[in-house]
Amino acid sequence: MAKRDYYEVLGVERGSSDAELKKAYRRLAMKHHPDRNPGDKASEDMFKEANEAYEVLSDSSKRAAYDQYGHAGVDPSMGGGGGGFGGQNFSDIFGDVFSDFFGGGRGGSRGGAQRGSDLRYTLELNLEEAVRGTTVNIRVPTLVNCKPCDGSGAKKGSSPVTCPTCGGIGQVRMQQGFFSVQQTCPRCHGQGKIISDPCDSCHGEGRVEEYKTLSVKVPAGVDTGDRIRLSGEGEAGTQGGPTGDLYVVINVREHAIFQRDGKHLFCEVPISFVDAALGGELEIPTLDGRVKLKIPEGTQTGKQFRIRGKGVAPVRGGGAGDLMCRVAVETPVNLSRRQRELLEELRGSLDDDNSHSPKTTGWFEGVKRFFGDL
């Protein structure tokens, strides 16, 4: 099944900014996260698809490659390079094509030391941890150099030998009709060396699977989609090649009270209709503790109050955002007889004066005009 276009997956245009990409990814990640959709295979697939798309498009080099070559530019099975895939670079992809047809002298580019693959780890945080910063220990599966053979793949006391088929180049040249075609050596599989006496621990691979426990320092202000790079904590390279990197991708869980949009926080504050009518003072929760909010008389549902500086300080610097509190006026329920009597008395007193409910009065006048025009 063909992969969908990464921009289509995130629902953005090709020229979208990094901020737009991040916002689109955050929306999809929140919507389809497995914690919010347990047992929903479709949502799980969409979550993985969004992760894959954002991993490519949020990296400038990968995005440039994807924009130019499409999925082939970032697909490891097609030779795509870049973090997280550990594949070849693009000169390898297209250089090999011309080498195959015209016998170009690129043999050996695949053999020898190769850099280890980059790894990706999704780190779940609550909102408080993301806003204040934290240090978290994570356990990551990876490939490390085999200690008994020191990464050579050969049993201790022996060494890999030059492949006699390709002479250590890693590729062989074959004649196909009028063309001289260069192909990966079938004996050493492009490594240029063979192991006649493989290590018992790694079976000649030179690397073994292992879990690493790492301490990750998360800076204050991170948000869903942000990445922390741990240099040299990816998979070990082969034949002495450098180790890849580990990218820790942040995913902030949904909060019970606050919603976040960039550096601003939003919450809904329920108030009684009495406080809405007469005004009052409420204690509002913030991430730094409680603050008092004055409610003016005549406050309506939907009225939004701004508490400055009680949002989030962005990870890349700048002042903290604001906390936006939206009022929701509650209608009382389960009234006692006395309470009903008081409300009936209040309703009777209000019916004589339309100035108490200007919106209601205006709405009914509009209805009358509407039917009068029919």
Swiss-Prot record:
GO annotation, biological process: chaperone cofactor-dependent protein refolding; DNA replication; protein refolding; response to heat
Pfam families named among the record's database cross-references: DnaJ (PF00226), DnaJ_C (PF01556), DnaJ_CXXCXGXG (PF00684)
CXXCXGXG motif repeats: 146-153, 163-170, 185-192, 199-206
Entry keyword ATP-binding: no
Residues engaged in binding Zn(2+) 2: C163, C166, C185, C188
Main location: cytoplasm
Keywords: Chaperone, Cytoplasm, DNA replication, Metal-binding, Repeat, Stress response, Zinc, Zinc-finger
PROSITE patterns found in the cross-reference section: DNAJ_1, DNAJ_2, ZF_CR
Positions of CR-type zinc fingers: 133-211
Localization: Cytoplasm
Domain J: start-end pairs: 5-70
GO terms of molecular function: ATP binding; heat shock protein binding; unfolded protein binding; zinc ion binding
A single Gene Ontology CC term: cytoplasm
Residue positions binding Zn(2+) 1: C146, C149, C199, C202
Cofactor note: Binds 2 Zn(2+) ions per monomer.
Entries under InterPro entries matching the protein: DnaJ (IPR012724), DnaJ_C (IPR002939), DnaJ_domain (IPR001623), DnaJ_domain_CS (IPR018253), HSP40/DnaJ_pept-bd (IPR008971), HSP_DnaJ_Cys-rich_dom (IPR001305), HSP_DnaJ_Cys-rich_dom_sf (IPR036410), J_dom_sf (IPR036869)
Glycoprotein recorded as keyword: no
The family this protein is said to belong to: Belongs to the DnaJ family.
Domain notes: The J domain is necessary and sufficient to stimulate DnaK ATPase activity. Zinc center 1 plays an important role in the autonomous, DnaK-independent chaperone activity of DnaJ. Zinc center 2 is essential for interaction with DnaK and for DnaJ activity.
Alphabetical list of PANTHER family matching this protein: CHAPERONE PROTEIN DNAJ (PTHR43096:SF48), DNAJ HOMOLOG 1, MITOCHONDRIAL-RELATED (PTHR43096)
UniProt cross-references to HAMAP family, sorted A to Z: DnaJ
Assembly behavior: Homodimer.
Protein role: Participates actively in the response to hyperosmotic and heat shock by preventing the aggregation of stress-denatured proteins and by disaggregating proteins, also in an autonomous, DnaK-independent fashion. Unfolded proteins bind initially to DnaJ; upon interaction with the DnaJ-bound protein, DnaK hydrolyzes its bound ATP, resulting in the formation of a stable complex. GrpE releases ADP from DnaK; ATP binding to DnaK triggers the release of the substrate protein, thus completing the reaction cycle.
Protein name as catalogued: Chaperone protein DnaJ
Organism: Pseudomonas fluorescens (strain ATCC BAA-477 / NRRL B-23932 / Pf-5)
Gene that encodes it: dnaJ
